[in-house]
Amino acid sequence: MSATMSAMSNNGAFEDLESLREPQRGFHHLEVPATSPSPWPESLRPLECPITGAGRVTTLAEFLRVTSATALVVVVDGVLVHEWYGSGVSREDRLLGNSATKSALALVTGLAVDRGLIPDLDVPVGELVPALRVGGYERVTVRQVLTMTSGVGWVEDYHDPHSPASQLIARWRQGLGGVRTLLPGIPDGEEPGTRYAYCSPDSMVLDWARESATGTTLTEAVHELWSLVGAEHPAVVGLDAPVDRGGVALAAGAFAATARDWARLGRLQVDGTWDGVPVVSPTWVEASSRPEQPFLRPGRLPSTLTTHAGFGYHWWPLDDDGDRVMADGMRGQFVYVDRPRRTVVVKTSAWPYGDAWWDRQCRDLCYLALPAIAEAAAAG
């Protein structure tokens, strides 16, 4: 992958944009066709709202600039009301969600649960995937990987090139395959279900268990979802190797879609329906939007992650009731859902890779700004 633009993000330029826009040019992938496209109804209007954060009040335009936004899409009650794209990005571009992919995985997992294909979230993942009957996942349940409370001995550290996390990502980026073969070798750590730790292998184990239970790959599951919500454009699912060499989806972070179509996933998380037709059950939506344990509530997660959100079923709730949730991906990819206001805000970005200070500052600002944008848009 080559970058066509580079500069420090605080002047509005994008670092390594090409790794986030149409990212399939840099990795093995499968395309998810848009077989039943249904464009959003539109009532586009200017959007102005003050953004308060970092001790000052700024404008929406300045917020987009200083956080290196690449796209902003706002949908209120199923109507597209605001749309903006940064330089070099268009409404047709598929934008890599990074770990926002995990929230898409939660939705297709919900479909499997609703259909009884995963009848019990408290079943050990090893009962669905025999290869996981050893190692750190031996006693871990589907519920525990959904809530990232597996307790396995994993550190999400991509700065150390020799860390297991870096090795896993390298296998994907280099197309070496075999990502799933690494999962049984992850050791145990703490008692499952007793603490939260951000763990991308939990997402990969979840998808492996879902695939085993349903007989469908992530690409096939997303294809069904894409048809149900009338996606306008094909999406992309990244693989760890070519299909003919047994490549599987990197379910923790390699899904790309247009900003408009990312908004469809947010709209589905409002109440589980599409145009009044049930897609995912309200029971699943409610459960996935809320923290199940006190230590999963907003403000209770490790402060190195966020002080603004908790954790549900691969969604980040901003309150104990799950009224406001976020899909959150590395380098500034967000799908914010205000469920009572039936409003979705998609913001994609091109933050510098590996800059922990920049990431934390911008992430904190986005967790303050996106709710304000949703409230202003819903108010008309």
Question: Which residue ranges define each predicted feature?
Answer:
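Active-site-proximal loop and beta-strand segments within enzyme catalytic domains
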Residues: 40-43, 47-63, 79, 89-92, ...
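Structured C-terminal helix/loop/strand segments within mature extracytoplasmic catalytic/sensor domains
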Residues: 1, 5-14, 327-380
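Active-site Gly/Thr loop motif
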Residues: 232-240, 289-344
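Active-site-proximal alpha-helical segments within enzyme catalytic domains
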Residues: 202-209, 251-275, 333-349
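Active-site SXXK
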Residues: 78, 96-121, 145, 206-210, ...
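Active-site helix/loop module of the DD-peptidase/beta-lactamase fold
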Residues: 96, 115-153, 185, 212-252, ...
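Catalytic-site signature segments of enzymes, centered on catalytic residues
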Residues: 83-85, 91-92, 157-243, 253
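N-terminal leader/targeting segments and the immediately adjacent pre-domain N-terminus
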Residues: 1-90, 113-119, 147, 181-185, ...
